[in-house]
Structure formats: C-alpha cells, structure tokens
Amino acid sequence: MRSMIRMTLAAAALGLAVPALAQNAPMVGGAPMMANKTIVENASKANNLTTLVAAVKEAGLVDTLSSKGPFTVFAPTNAAFEKLPAGTVDKLMKPDMKADLKKVLTYHVVAGKLDAKELMAKAKMGGESANLKTVEGATLTVKMDGDKLALIDGKGGGAFVTQPDVDQSNGVVHVIDSVLMPKM
C-alpha cells in the first residue's frame, strides 16, 4: 500500500514538473523549445517556422538536422520567407530545384554550436565582423549592429538575429528576420 502511495505521489510530482519545465523553455512561434529535442523536432512545433520546416523536408535535410551535430542554425521565420521576391519559395520547392533549395538551407547552417556570446566575440576579435564557414561551403559574415547580431550573405543581403540562443539537443538555433542567399 505504501509503495502504491509513493508511486502515486511520484507520478503527481512528475505531472507538475513537466509543465514547469516547459514554462522555462524559450518560446518560438508559440511553442516551447525543449533543449532535449532536436532542431527538427522543435522547429516542427513552431507556427512561425512552418515554411522552413517544409523546405527542410523538401530538400531531404530532416535526417541531417536530426542527427547528433552539433549545428548552429540561423532559422528564417515565415515572415522572412515572405520578404523574398514573389514566386521564389514556390520555385525553390519544386522537385527539380532541390539542389538549389538545399544550397540555400545549408547556407543557414554552421558546424558546431555557436551561441550569441561566441558570435559576438568572433565579431569583436575580427575588428567588427567575422566570417563563418557554412555547411553549404560558402562564408557568411557576422557583425554587431548596435546591440544586435547581424548576418550578411554572399549577395550583400542581411538579416538580424531576433531570437538568439534557442538550445537544442544537437546544437543551437538563432531565429532571423530574413532569408540569407548564397551566390548561385
């Protein structure tokens, strides 16, 4: 009887602890981002990253971004994709454009886990900016713009980090406000 009471109390305590843990997790797109989940698992729950998740699936990158990593992902929001010229997303999502889509997406990924503090330190050490080698193979420039982290792509376009340091089991995500475009 005592063991039954202990088990009931333990289950009740766990039931109270799980929502408390979720409340401490950073929220992205209305969903808690759990540090014990992968980049893909967490992004799939965020209602402001649905275009990114659809693109990751279309490009065949789910397994890669679910693997051990670690990765630093600069994750453009749905609004970021909407800033692209009309028809760009639809064009990239076509099966015959898979290689270009993969190139764009992997341009948003850096090997290793780089939090905002490390990115800022790299920019300061580089005398205002630093180059990051992306998984795509090209470089992305990170710099400080006031108190914000800014990214400059291969075409001179830029994005600001709007939500830094969203820890994942296989890296870190920094939510950004524009899609970065490599030279194609």
PLM features per residue range, with description:
Residues 17-19:
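N-terminal signal peptide c-region/cleavage motif recognized by signal peptidases
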